[in-house]
Amino acid sequence: MPHASLPTENVLQGRTFDAVLFDMDGTLIDSTPAVDRSWAAWAREWGVAKDDTAHGRPARDIIEELVPADRVDEAIARVLALETADTDDIIVLPGAAALMTSLPEARRAIVTSCARPLAEARLAASAFPAPAVIVTIDDTPNGKPEPDPFLEGAARLGVDPSRCLVIEDAPAGLQAGRAAGCTTIAVTGTYPAAELDADLVVPGLDSLRIEVTPDGLIVHVESPKS
């Protein structure tokens, strides 16, 4: 069960953090239409059933369940080509750009299950103000739900993972954040609150404000701006 439902109470009140590690798809940007088109096209080409429950997992993990082992690399390359070519309809989610740019460069990173070319294509297509540190599936031996991606993000910022906030929209990412020893915030939209096991669950990033203080980052939960 989630530790907190959609909040009126900020369960993180009184705590400070050193950095924020953001998931990308479904958290900062909405690429769902493009993802659905690309994976549907791939599934038709390869004669497999499209998995609608795979959000937040690396493409390799999904594909390994669907195609013979000797064709996995070929299948991954094809999915990546389809996804990188289709960046239409990708939008920045409410509050995401403002929250990202409110943080100092040394205290923010994106940690995504995308390959780097795909992450860069989607960020460029949406004109999102990307941070300097972006960890992709290409940078770690294991992807979400293993802790490796968030451990790598913390290491690149020079921060103890236990002092990091992870902001995610998917169960696999939240599991990875917890396994890395981070505090987790979930945003609803991709999944309902009941499926998000996090320290705090909010309806969107426009419900959050992060104050930068000499002692660290302080999380404030606010009503979304209309």
Language-model region placement:
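Glycine- and other small-residue-rich loops at beta-strand/loop junctions that grip anionic moieties
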Residues: V111
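Asp-based, Mg2+/Mn2+-dependent phosphohydrolase catalytic module
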Residues: M1-D18, T101, R107, R116-S226
